[in-house]
């Protein structure tokens, strides 16, 4: 059965979950937004209220902004860009951007000197194995020049450089985004394992745990049956207004995710970028989704806390093999960002923290704008120049350290706050 029933703007929910019958149209909430009277909270604010025992009623909350940030492999861009003068080549047979293969078409743009193309966020540069599509998209947003190489069907090579301003069309399409949280992984084997699920080889004998998921602020954790999130819902994708196209690939009632699209031109480099792993570069994105409170049931779903959310721990060699189960409280109780102590640096011949940093945040210091809060630097530096408590979890008799976070609650919180402000200003309506 589809998770996306037909819903209109005036879709109505009748619910009397706690003795209070809320019957509210989304259009009524939009009226309050336009009048400047809407009560809008971030998911973080709601969770703090729940922990403090100050649980709001449904008539006291109009919208809650939820968000997640993490590695999202199902990311691609659709682009149209001019390469050379019309007539210089018939059509493209292959295209590369900064050495990353792109896929020309489907429109041939015959003799126009331009190309339509798809390029994957997980694409790897032929010239630099640490550079991929996520880094490329961020570089474009920063205004950097990008090298374009087209090989035509006639065998002619055409090279040029472009910036974001030169690319007429650039849309991100997320085929699988904002999973309802995810999985933690360990390696119970006797040899290290290369995987996209860790920034470096997963240590043997359950020597470390990596995980994904922003826990109780995750959009679909707060609307697990998708009562308010549906095809056509407006969201923020990496800071840009975007839209839910429908279910993402591999979406299921238990593990739903979203297919999204937004204009790359409008995105912010803070929220999208590359993430190096032991198996090559990946891409991270940030998604914020509004949840209009149309019923008591919707509000009750928003009361979920990290301690309520199960996090399966699986074998990285076979992710279908679940070893145990913990909660998101177990993995999100530590520090959000590392602290740099330069006086502790012993000038190692090879700085493991810099070599392993997934976002290139370490270069003669710590760039907190690039930092993802993954914790890899603290785990890797033998002299303690980078300090961060990411916590440990129990797996049987073992105390297993958390060595890599592939999600970032700080960026997620920032984008949920941006969305809250847009709604409060009357600039973002529910759909």
Swiss-Prot record:
- Segment forming the signal sequence: none
Question: What GO annotations for molecular function exist for this entry?
Answer: 4 iron, 4 sulfur cluster binding; metal ion binding; oxidoreductase activity
- Where exactly are the transmembrane stretches of this chain? none
User: Which Pfam families would you find in this protein's record?
Assistant: Fer4, HcyBio
Give residue ranges for domain 4Fe-4S ferredoxin-type: 336-367, 362-391
Keyword vocabulary terms for this entry: 4Fe-4S, Iron, Iron-sulfur, Metal-binding, Repeat
* Lineage: superkingdom: Archaea
Q: InterPro entries annotated for this entry?
A: 4Fe4S_Fe-S-bd (IPR017896), 4Fe4S_Fe_S_CS (IPR017900), HcyBio (IPR002708), Methan_mark_16 (IPR017677)
NCBIfam families, alphabetized: methan_mark_16 (TIGR03287)
Listed name of the protein:
Uncharacterized protein MTH_1684
Q: What is the lineage of its organism?
A: Archaea, Methanobacteriati, Methanobacteriota, Methanomada group, Methanobacteria
């Amino acid at each position: 059965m589809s998770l996306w029933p037909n819903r209109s703007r005036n879709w109505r929910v009748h619910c009397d979950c706690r003795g209070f019958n809320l019957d509210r149209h989304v259009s009524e909430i939009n009226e309050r937004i336009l009048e400047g009277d809407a009560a809008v909270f971030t998911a973080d604010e709601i969770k703090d209220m729940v922990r403090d025992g100050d649980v709001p009623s449904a008539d006291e909350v109009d919208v809650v902004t939820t968000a997640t940030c993490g590695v999202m492999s199902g990311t691609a861009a659709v682009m149209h860009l001019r390469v050379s003068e019309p007539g210089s080549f018939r059509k493209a047979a292959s295209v590369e951007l900064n050495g990353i293969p792109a896929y020309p078409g489907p429109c041939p743009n015959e003799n126009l000197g331009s190309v339509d193309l798809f390029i994957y966020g997980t694409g790897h540069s032929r010239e630099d194995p640490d550079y991929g599509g996520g880094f490329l998209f961020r570089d474009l947003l920063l205004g950097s020049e990008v090298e374009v190489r087209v090989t035509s069907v006639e065998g002619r090579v055409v090279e040029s450089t472009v910036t974001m301003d030169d690319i007429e069309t650039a849309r991100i399409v997320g085929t699988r985004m904002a999973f309802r949280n995810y999985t933690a992984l360990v390696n119970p084997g006797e040899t290290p394992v290369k995987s996209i699920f860790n920034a470096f080889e997963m240590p043997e004998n359950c020597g470390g745990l990596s995980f994904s998921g922003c826990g109780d602020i995750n959009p679909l954790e707060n609307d697990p049956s998708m009562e308010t999130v549906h095809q056509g819902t407006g969201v923020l994708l990496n800071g840009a207004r975007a839209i839910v196209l429908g279910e993402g690939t591999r979406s299921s009632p238990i593990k739903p995710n979203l297919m999204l699209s937004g204009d790359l031109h409008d995105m912010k480099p803070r929220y999208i970028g590359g993430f190096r792993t032991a198996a090559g570069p990946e891409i991270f994105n940030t998604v914020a989704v509004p949840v209009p409170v149309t019923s008591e049931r919707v509000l009750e779903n928003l009361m979920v806390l990290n301690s309520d959310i199960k996090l399966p721990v699986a074998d990285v060699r076979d992710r279908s093999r679940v070893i145990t189960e913990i909660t998101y409280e177990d993995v999100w109780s530590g520090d959000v960002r590392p602290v740099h102590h330069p006086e502790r640096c012993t000038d190692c011949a090879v700085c493991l923290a810099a070599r392993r940093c997934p976002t290139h945040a370490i270069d003669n210091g710590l760039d907190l704008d690039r930092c993802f809060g993954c914790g890899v630097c603290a785990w890797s530096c033998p002299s303690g120049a980078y300090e961060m408590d990411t916590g440990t979890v129990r797996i049987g008799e073992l105390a297993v350290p958390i060595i890599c976070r592939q999600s970032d609650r700080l960026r997620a919180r920032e984008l949920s706050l941006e969305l809250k402000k847009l709604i409060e200003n009357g600039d973002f309506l529910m759909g």
